[in-house]
């Protein structure tokens, strides 16, 4: 997908801005009204009004697009891609598809799909074609997949962002699981009846985007981040001191005093640990 670098730099704020030329890919259709829902902003606050997630607030108004992550309601029915649209709630694009029976839904757009293409979802083996959805056991080794379920029937949870994918490595010795190599290089087992979509998630050039100025970040609903070393000691463990002082501890800390950076956070007692063959950071 072509990226668009700003040539007419009217001010220094957009001197390094790089954006995506959406006109080459997206259609101009208005969103399907029946598949929109209200999205309330919480600005990172909980029900008591306390900040639980920092750096959230403001930004443009959004409506939530209801995405079909399960793709199991209309098995073996051909669906026609009607439009490819921008979704402000995610980095990948979404496609409006219309089934033979008139039902419409949004799905994540696979890379390379176009308006007028046909996609199918099934619980059985079907053509290995970009956009088709089926259980992992029917997809051959080496195939790139995205929109992957972790629990059969729950809906996709893995490889949903722009350019994300996993590679099928084959069945394990029991024949009950399929081994997948995720984008993080982690190798993990998935139940063979978990569904996945063939192909790579759309908008693969998303990682090349440079926002260029602080105002664009604010439009996204992200507020500024203040360095801990610029705070007072009562606000952050890194705060205080004369001038530019070092951390003064054995390791960097979070604002709440816990060790930060390079600390393992996964609980090895989780039952799913036995499904991980190789951790993402193992050599």
Swiss-Prot record:
Part of the 50S ribosomal subunit. Forms a bridge to the 30S subunit in the 70S ribosome. Keywords: Ribonucleoprotein, Ribosomal protein, RNA-binding, rRNA-binding. It comes from Mycoplasmoides gallisepticum (strain R(low / passage 15 / clone 2)). PANTHER family: LARGE RIBOSOMAL SUBUNIT PROTEIN UL2M, RIBOSOMAL PROTEIN L2. HAMAP family: Ribosomal_uL2_B. One of the primary rRNA binding proteins. Required for association of the 30S and 50S subunits to form the 70S ribosome, for tRNA binding and peptide bond formation. It has been suggested to have peptidyltransferase activity; this is somewhat controversial. Makes several contacts with the 16S rRNA in the 70S ribosome. InterPro entries: NA-bd_OB-fold, Rib_uL2_dom2, Ribosomal_uL2, Ribosomal_uL2_bac/org-type, Ribosomal_uL2_C, Ribosomal_uL2_CS, Ribosomal_uL2_dom3, Ribosomal_uL2_RNA-bd_dom. SMART domains: Ribosomal_L2, Ribosomal_L2_C. One of its GO terms (biological process) is cytoplasmic translation. One of its GO terms (cellular component) is large ribosomal subunit. The keyword Glycoprotein does not apply. This is Large ribosomal subunit protein uL2. GO terms for molecular function: rRNA binding; structural constituent of ribosome; transferase activity. Residues 256-269 have a biased composition (Basic residues). It comes from the Bacteria. Residues 37-59, 219-283 are annotated as: Disordered. The gene is rplB. SUPFAM superfamilies: Nucleic acid-binding proteins, Translation proteins SH3-like domain. Pfam families: Ribosomal_L2 (PF00181), Ribosomal_L2_C (PF03947). The keyword Membrane does not apply. Belongs to the universal ribosomal protein uL2 family.
